Amino acid sequence: MNQFTKLIAAQLNLKEQAVENTLALLEEGCTIPFISRYRKEKTGNMDEVNIEAIAQANEKLSEMAKRKETILKTIEEQGKLSDELKKRIEQCWDATELEDIYLPYKPKRRTRAQIAREAGLEPLAQLLLFQRERNPEQAARKFVGDKVKDVEAALQGAKDIIAETVSENEQSRNQIRGEFRRGAIITSKVVAKKKDEEEAQRFSDYFDFSEPLKKCSSHRLLAMRRGEAAGFLRVSISADDEQCQDKLKRHYVHGFGECQTLVGEAVDDAFKRLLKPSIETEFAALSKQKADEEAIVVFAENLRQLLLAAPLGQKRVMAVDPGFANGCKTCCLDAQGNLIHHEIVYPHPPRNKKSEATAAIQRMVKMYQVEAMAVGNGTASRETSDWLHSIDFDHPVDIYVVSEDGASIYSASKIARDEFPDEDVTVRGAVSIGRRLMDPLAELVKIDPKSIGVGQYQHDVDQTQLKKSLDTVVMSCVNSVGVNLNTASQHLLTYVSGLGPTLAKNIVEYRRENGAFASRAQLKKVPRLGPSAFEQCAGFLRIPGAKNPLDNSAVHPERYALVEQMAKDQGVTVKQLVEDKALQKKIDIRKYVSAEVGMPTLTDIMAELDKPGLDPRGEVEKFEFDASIKEIEDLQVGMVVPGIVTNITKFGAFVDIGVHNDGLVHVSQMSNRYIQDPSELVKLHEHVMVRVAEVDLKRKRIALSMKGVK
């Protein structure tokens, strides 16, 4: 059994056997999507969230085990590792407690207490702590000598030793932590000499701010930390000093007298000089970590919604990157997303060549049989969209507004240069907008998630944890949808379970040299793609039109024989079984349960036979803004207008209502009932109706409400 199984099972409230099996699969190199989809019997039908939690817990415990090895070695080298201490360290699995145990033995720079110990004052410190000496000054005289010049120095040295002892005592530290947990206050003040700077005004809400730390939301804490990093704010976390000191004294000072006074002074010094700064730093780090985790969860959920946005599918698309002076960049794409034509038109000021631009658009739509248009949502988007809606075409053309976030990042990237070496960044950016409409997932995986514009303080959080979380989300989304083996880009294939950059490149090269894959089994001919990689990736790769219909489904090749047996028992071929719903309903899956295959897998197989290769993302919806509203000045309080959710945070949702500035629906304005998390009510890119609650023309801020709006 894995050494961490019991700990993880208890921590996550999961069954030990399921945790043990999951850890074994992870150890074998299985990916989370693979385990979740194809090893349900072993995991007890766990979802990706639980499997990811097990993987993270195992990683943390492994790191702690390594830390314990270092600690044990260090203490042993000092000759201070007793059997009791060793046992305590080995049994400890709380990071804070572990560091507290280690603190008295931790190598540190030469402290006042160490200097006092070197001067032989440890016995005097113990004498004072015992608090039975009636005349401490007289006792201190015995310690005056070469290293201690007088009684005062002796007593001060003893107090320094007591202060360090108190500050390194586990109970003392936990007492102060308790006070901080109950009553710590986070305070933010403006740096006086920077108060009037324009950039500082972004943090004006925090110029004189104070709040209990336990009530401080993640977005407020991250905003304060950003202001602090920029040099505009001073942020501190503190508890009630007097209460903390009283608590310590109740533990260390017994009765009244000269000894007690000296010990009390040492305790006060321990708190102010050593304990308080240490615990403040600890709580600052813990609160930042908690805020980071919350912000990363928000970002990850937004990214998931964005990646799983409904695709238009394989249709001929005209992509339009709007602009005024630089014109509107138009790119015509075929149904596979290949660039077949591009040109620039100038319908807006300052050139105002609207009639020529209209004629050019009509010509391109007819020539390339354009079925849909993707209009970027940046500069001149509203004007361009209105203009395109006014044009008459000889066949129906649907017009969609598409987010441009990150398109400019993509257009200058190596991926874009490799795809379009002969085109400039404007063409590449426009192509990306068009492809996002056709298949958001396939296009957005090419862009650094942090550039997609759906985060909350994404540049302020732990970047390593953020990248880890977002990579996990991308991989989860790619594998939940499945990937067309014959059309997927190298970059998209990289995220398929079991592949990675090298095998993705090898697949694309094999495809280029040998033509389209006819079956999943052919994957085994790809250089370096061995049995393990095949097992991990095969179920997530699709081959539309394959001879075996299972090759275009989520049924894993390891279960083909089972489906063939089902078909044989019905007296038909697999192809006939897939095409005949009535036959499928006749199958009693309980007959096919075995030691390896249980009801969860069989249920999944039947769902795939019913709708093989079904895309879970749904269908794209058209949207139009209120035609009477084009600028923020057109808004009036009380108006009810349509909008698109562009970003979701812990404090609310931002909604584009077509006036160049997104409005905010604060979480308190989302419903008449209490809402803890905005994502309970809205999804990214959801079409919503909102009421204008407030308009601040000077600051270009719009407050919106969804209360009572249908």
PLM ranges: what are they?
Residues N13, A310-L312, M475-E509, A627-V665, ...:
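C-terminal accessory/binding modules appended to enzymatic or scaffolding proteins
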Residues T31-I32, T43, D47-Q114, A119-K149, ...:
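Accessory alpha-helical DNA-binding modules that contact the DNA backbone or grooves
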Residues Y38-K40, L129, D240, P322, ...:
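Short, ordered loop/turn segments at secondary-structure junctions
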Residues F143, K149-V151, F209-S210, Q245-F271, ...:
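Low-complexity, acidic/Ser/Thr- and charged residue-rich accessory regions of DNA metabolism proteins
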